[in-house]
Amino acid sequence: MSIRIIPQDELGSSEKRTADMIPPLLFPRLKNLYNRRAERLRELAENNPLGDYLRFAALIAHAQEVVLYDHPLEMDLTTRIKEASAQGKPPLDIHVLPRDKHWQKLLMALIAELKPEMSGPALAVIENLEKASTQELEDMASALFASDFSSVSSDKAPFIWAALSLYWAQMANLIPGKARAEYGEQRQYCPVCGSMPVSSMVQIGTTQGLRYLHCNLCETEWHVVRVKCSNCEQSGKLHYWSLDDEQAAIKAESCDDCGTYLKILYQEKDPKIEAVADDLASLVLDARMEQEGYARSSINPFLFPGEGE
């Protein structure tokens, strides 16, 4: 199954009625998203060996919250959605959508917000980014979108991505369309922007018990059935791993067909669990999965592979 974005005026009455049964897409709910993430990161930093880095990530998330409201985005995506729908492509496809200068404006605003909080190497990194040319910044963004992580140092990548993510989340939040599920391929990628997930979440509330993958760029969530590999869609050789017990709020779902894994977070076990923060705070589980020979099928926006990884 893939998920395709259908423009509002192209939906029939039956599609409008059924669209709400199992929502295939949950567009970004930006209100308090970054504040909630920052709070969760700070909470998880207590008694965590990665505490300093989690607090660093919390600073970036808080800056995203501030910049989000200081620099709103106005854009009409109606035409873009129609074109993408006709082509069967994500409307905000990272590989083809031209980037507006707005994202670099967001980056500079993030740097200004973060500067007073940074010192040492981190301060040097953002000052270096502040001095970079427009083309240099565009080249780094293109490299990240192409998964050419050796071309962007792992200390710069989180700042670049934070601005790109904010820009894409603002655009995704403006999409004036609905979504429906259609048979197809590549459901392992975000149907809105084509990026990869950071983790998956079994939710509570109106989507109780449903699993949604959370995009590491535009913050959209999309439905993928449980007990099926989110990477290759096979279901015969899945295994579930945790560091605690069977009731753990965080597990890794591994697939022996494709050799990858993705974390599953369970809101019913911990209502405060958060897709990015809890994934980052559970790197010990990633280390275990690597020891078992599995490759991660996702990337956390605060932790990019470095050169040679």
Swiss-Prot record:
InterPro entries: FdhE-like_sf, FdhE_C, FdhE_central, FdhE_N, Formate_DH_accessory
GO biological process, one term: protein maturation
Annotated GO CC locations: cytosol
Entry GO MF terms: ferric iron binding
Primary subcellular site in the record, as a coarse category: cytoplasm
Keywords on record: Cytoplasm
Source superkingdom: Bacteria
Pfam family, one: FdhE_C
Keyword Lipoprotein: no
Subcellular location as annotated: Cytoplasm
Summary of the function given for this chain in its UniProt record: Necessary for formate dehydrogenase activity.
Database matches in PANTHER family: PROTEIN FDHE
Recorded family membership: Belongs to the FdhE family.
Protein's name according to its UniProt entry: Protein FdhE
Record organism: Escherichia coli (strain SMS-3-5 / SECEC)
Gene, per the UniProt record: fdhE
